[in-house]
Curated annotation (Swiss-Prot):
This is Folate receptor alpha. It comes from Bos taurus. The secreted form is derived from the membrane-bound form either by cleavage of the GPI anchor, or/and by proteolysis catalyzed by a metalloprotease. It is a lipid-anchor; GPI-anchor; GPI-like-anchor. One of its GO terms (cellular component) is clathrin-coated vesicle. Disulfide bonds join C36-C64, C56-C104, C65-C108, C88-C174, C95-C145, C134-C208, C138-C188, C151-C168. GO terms for molecular function: folic acid binding; folic acid receptor activity; signaling receptor activity.
Length: 241
């Protein structure tokens, strides 16, 4: 009896050691739908948020963001990321609305599962990579921002944060957006380290993520997420970072 207990104990120890060493497995395809990423302000699970603020309101029936997060998404230098949109003078309102909508999509959407990837970052454990943004949404973003000013083409890193919010690094000159982003694809693909990849598909195709949609017509991104979850080799679900 004693030797049997010893064997069982050894097996348990080996199993525990193996489990501790085993890497976290990628999300199963069934886990790619209706999910929130493990990031700084996201809820653990999506659900109704009836009072989401202004541009974030399309996600009120099913959201990964809280009401407070949606309010902060509309503020300059908000507590979310202390990001200053006006780092090269005042950003045009028509341009800023795209960045607010971009923030709402990132914080609130439960339909980004096929593009969620693990990262080893202090402020988040997951990010999105290569989200296929509808070409019209990318085009209008670029058109409305091309006459605003910035000093960098990658806004994820390289800022001067000594003041508590982002400022242009030394020797980084302010130029119009179309200097740093000469094409719509340059803007959408590069500004957030390839979080987006501008799609050849159009809005309503069921093959690209819409940053803007009419909630009274339903959320078109649900169909898009389902398609890429079921077709992981379709070309818009990158396999690594």
């Amino acid at each position: 009896m004693a030797w049997q207990m010893t064997q069982l104990l050894l097996l348990a120890l080996v199993a525990a050691a193996w489990g501790a060493q085993a890497p976290r497995t990628p999300r199963a395809r069934t886990d790619l739908l209706n999910v929130c990423m493990d990031a700084k302000h996201h809820k653990a699970e999506p659900g109704p948020e009836d009072s989401l603020h202004e541009q974030c309101s399309p996600w009120r029936k099913n959201a990964c963001c809280s009401v407070n997060t949606s309010i902060e998404a509309h503020k300059d230098i908000s507590y979310l990321y202390r990001f200053n949109w006006d780092h090269c003078g005042k950003m045009e309102p028509a341009c800023k609305r795209h960045f607010i909508q971009d923030t709402c999509l990132y914080e609130c959407s439960p339909n980004l599962g096929p593009w969620i990837r693990e990262v080893n970052q202090r402020w988040r454990k997951e990010r999105v990579l290569g989200v296929p943004l509808c070409k019209e949404d990318c085009q209008s973003w670029w058109e409305d921002c091309r006459t605003s000013y910035t000093c960098k083409s990658n806004w994820h890193k390289g800022w001067n944060w000594t003041s508590g919010y982002n400022q242009c690094p030394v020797k980084a000159a302010c130029h119009r957006f179309d200097f740093y982003f000469p094409t719509p694809a340059a803007l959408c693909n590069e500004i957030w380290s390839h979080s987006y990849k501008v799609s050849n598909y159009s809005r309503g195709s069921g093959r690209c993520i819409q940053m803007w949609f009419d909630p009274f017509q339903g959320n078109p991104n649900e169909e898009v997420a389902r398609f890429y979850a079921e077709n992981p080799t379709s070309g818009s679900t990158p396999q690594g970072i």
